[in-house]
Structure formats: structure tokens, C-alpha cells
Amino acid sequence: MSEQTDTPEESIYHDQRSVALRTTQSVYFVQEHDKVSMLGSLLNDHKENQVVIVVKSKKKADALSEFLISKEFNAHCVHGNHRQAQQKEAATKFNLGALNIIITTDMILKTLELENIKLVLSYDLPDSAQNYYIRLAFMKELGEAIALVSPEDEPLLSDIESNMKKEIEEKVLEGFVASATPNHTGKTKKDRTKKPRHRKNKVKKEQGA
């Protein structure tokens, strides 16, 4: 009897659409060279939360870890250059609340068995829309997802939104100006000419920040 009820719940709970709808999502358009500064500003509002930051490379994970530690964030990076015992130790500290921020890659995130994640911050978008949903699914509960999107990543964002059948809310931080919408080459799913996602001059402070 329990098998009959558990299986459908598991399937529905991890369905891409369900994951997207249960997660509060927002996107910040930003030039690549401004991402580090924006990350620090955003994390100031999440110092007490359990945060996972996902990047594309081990080198970037190391650099962000060093930066955040220099700003007195309780952060640590975990990637393929670390031994399995080191990865497990970091995950245990995170799950116990002794570590607030883990910076990692998609590949390692799948092995860490992290709990109580409140925010998934995509410093880099993944290489596919499917991996974006996988990132969100690791929260397992209601949570928040923030994506920092550089101009070259906007076509992938369009793919993600197309699969989700919903445009992710755009937010802007005071002091950060998004670039003009890049010239796409057929990858973008929707016409953004009437409402460009990267705006040159309009800067507003995020409400509640």
C-alpha cells in the first residue's frame, strides 16, 4: 500500500514543472566582470541561510571561495580536486549548520547529499536547461533560486523559461547596470525587442533589499 502512494508523490515532486513552480526564482542580468561584486551584495541578505553557489569550473570555485572568505562569509568550495573525505566533511558541516555557503560544480553537487538548502545561486548557468532544474531539485523543499546571467548566457535562459512556460522575474540591484541585449543568432526562443532583458540606463533598487 505504501509503495503505491510513495511512487506517484516522488514522481510529481521532482517533475521539472513542479520544481520550477515551488521555487521562488529571480534573475539578475550582469556583465561577467561585475558578477563577483554582485554576489557579495546579494549574499549580505542571506548570511543566516544555507546557500549553494554553483559555478562551471574548479578554478572559479576556488576564486569565489577565497573572495567570500576575505569578506568574512562562512564559505567553502568543494570540487573534483578534493578527496572524497574532504567533500564529505564539508557536506556534514553544511548539514549541521556549521558551514553556511558551499561553492561547487554541477558534477560534485550531485554527490554531496546536502540538506536544508534555502538558496541555490547559479553564479553560472549550467550547460543545459535540464541541469538548471536538477540544481533546484536539490532544495527538496520550498526555496529560492537566483541566477546571474551574462549576455552570452541569455539564449540558455530562454530555453529554461521555454521549458518552464514562464518568464523568470528580473531584478536589478542599485549600482549594477545590465548591458544592452546582445545580438542573438537564432538560439533565443522569444522576441525580446519590446522588452529587452538587459537594460542600459534604468537602474532601480530591489524592493525590500
Where are these regions (language model features)?
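Basic Arg/Gly/Lys-rich low-complexity intrinsically disordered segments
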Residues: M1-P8, L68, L96, N163-M164, ...
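Conserved interdomain hinge at the start of the Helicase C-terminal
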Residues: S18-I69
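Conserved nucleotide-binding/hydrolysis micro-motifs of P-loop NTPases
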Residues: K58-K60, H82-R83, M107-K110, L125-A129, ...
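Conserved segment of the helicase C-terminal RecA-like domain
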Residues: R135-S179
